[in-house]
Design a protein with these regions (language model features):
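Alpha-helical multipass membrane-protein architecture
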Residues: 2-290
Length: 290
């Protein structure tokens, strides 16, 4: 996509620099919310025109892709804590432009470059690149890299984070108790219990699976009439509920205990459109959706 030519690659690189900086400026979670809105708008473009351009280049590309805008914001937050500009490196809500420190925004831009390059690299791996979510995997890699690089106490230097500092672990405990997160290390306390996880996972999964099947079978008719592949809508149907889940993060930012389930709706929608054809005695590639 962004490797068609050197010019296209450089254009995407510049967009990734800006995307990471935007994520740092407005806060990683706000950036992710914008991803959600962009996904829904891009789906409207797909339904109207049959083109996945907006999904590929905007929603999941270097402009609003989570591996750029969210990952850049998350890395900048860890860096800001490392430099002593803020108290909590987990704070991916606060707009970091408010710190008045340009270096924080530059870190977001650098991690935008990292996300851009790593995602392209993963996508190019034979077989693996086409059988995994390269955007999501890049978010994980970027977060781990930022944690290792900046995760230490302020002023202690690079690569001296909690992954390296034994004093930050509980002494005299077994392995699991030793690494058990403290009061500030818990992200979603209301989603920790297995009963709650199963409830949210199953019901939001049904929600996303049903919506994805509806989009695949009904919205897909128009792109097919325009001459596009029959399974075009089905191949992107899981993104729709992912976008809704991303927007729900906006309400989480307002200190509401919202369910965080974008990782559920994305996979559930994908599973629905992949396995429904199997139930019909076909495969995804041979099933006729419209």
């Amino acid at each position: 996509m962004f490797t068609a030519s050197i010019g296209v690659f450089v254009f995407g690189l510049l967009a990734a620099i800006a995307g990471g900086a935007v994520g740092a400026s407005i806060g990683g979670n706000y950036g992710f919310v914008l991803t959600g809105f962009t996904v829904l708008a891009s789906w409207g473009i797909l339904a109207a025109t049959g083109s996945t351009f907006a999904l590929d280049y905007l929603a999941f590309g270097p402009f609003m892709g989570p591996h750029i805008i969210f990952a850049g914001g998350a890395a900048a937050a860890i860096y800001a804590r490392y430099k002593g500009y803020m108290d909590d490196g987990k704070d991916v809500n606060s707009p970091l432009a408010g710190l008045g420190r340009p270096d924080v925004i530059y870190v977001g831009a650098i991690f935008g470059i990292l996300g851009y390059a790593v995602q392209i690299g993963i996508a190019k791996i034979p077989w693996f690149g086409t059988h995994t979510d390269s955007v999501a995997l890049t978010v994980v890699i970027s977060g781990i890299a930022a944690r290792i690089l900046f995760g230490g106490d302020p002023g202690k230097g690079l690569f001296k984070g909690s992954l390296h500092s034994s004093h930050l672990y509980a002494e005299g405990k077994g392995l699991m108790a030793k690494i058990k997160p403290g009061p500030n290390g818990r992200w979603l306390e209301w989603q920790e219990r297995p009963s709650q996880l199963i409830t949210i996972g199953s019901l939001f999964g049904i929600f996303a699976g049903g919506a994805s099947l509806f989009l695949a079978a009904n919205i897909g008719a128009h792109p097919t009439d325009l001459g596009f592949a029959d399974g075009l809508a089905a191949a992107n149907a899981n993104n729709f509920c992912f976008g809704i889940s991303a927007i729900i993060i906006l309400f989480l930012i307002t200190n509401r205990n919202m369910p965080v389930q974008h990782h559920v709706t994305n996979i559930a929608g994908l599973a629905a459109v992949q396995f429904f054809p199997v139930l019909m005695g076909k495969s995804f590639s041979t099933f006729t959706w419209t």
